[in-house]
């Protein structure tokens, strides 16, 4: 199945890195990370195919309610609210998948692999509300 949406939880670091995601050929929704200093440059780079906002970003996609943030702040509060089917965060750069009650928590790790030496993404199947970590080469 084709990609319907790319969600990025921050730390593009530079606009040139963000532009590479246009090659995926699907829309992108993103939040700024703490290493995204060039905010206007990122907004401009993503404008042709996506958008980037200050976290947290709430969105509905394919019948699921998403919360996207860079740092997993107030995670217990968001989980207790039961308002979200999927919560995506990234600050630690460590891949993580877990389910808390009815909410799927996803940390895709880091695409670039600059800190951990491992380039990873998470792939979500919205029909089954399941995800897997994929290691890129």
Feature map (PLM): residue ranges:
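Core catalytic region of metal-dependent phosphoesterases/phosphodiesterases
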Residues: 1-60
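Active-site neighborhood of phospho(di)ester-bond hydrolases with catalytic His/Asp-centered motifs
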Residues: 5-11, 29-34, 67-70, 86-91, ...
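Active-site environment of divalent metal-dependent phosphoester hydrolases
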Residues: 13-16, 35-41, 73-78, 88-99, ...
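Binuclear metal-dependent phosphoesterase catalytic core
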Residues: 53-62, 99-137
């Amino acid at each position: 199945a084709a990609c319907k949406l790319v969600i990025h939880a921050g730390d593009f670091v530079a606009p040139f890195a963000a532009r590479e995601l246009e090659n995926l050929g699907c829309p992108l929704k993103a939040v700024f990370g703490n290493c995204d200093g060039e905010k206007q440059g990122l907004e401009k780079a993503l404008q042709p195919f996506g958008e980037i906002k200050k976290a947290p970003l709430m969105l509905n996609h394919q019948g699921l309610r998403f919360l996207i943030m860079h740092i997993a702040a107030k995670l217990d509060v968001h989980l207790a609210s039961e308002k979200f089917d999927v919560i995506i965060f990234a600050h630690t750069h460590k891949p993580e998948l877990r389910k808390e009650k009815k909410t799927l928590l996803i940390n895709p790790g880091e695409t670039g692999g600059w800190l951990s030496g491992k380039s990873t993404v998470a792939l979500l199947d919205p029909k089954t509300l399941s995800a897997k970590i994929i290691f890129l080469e």
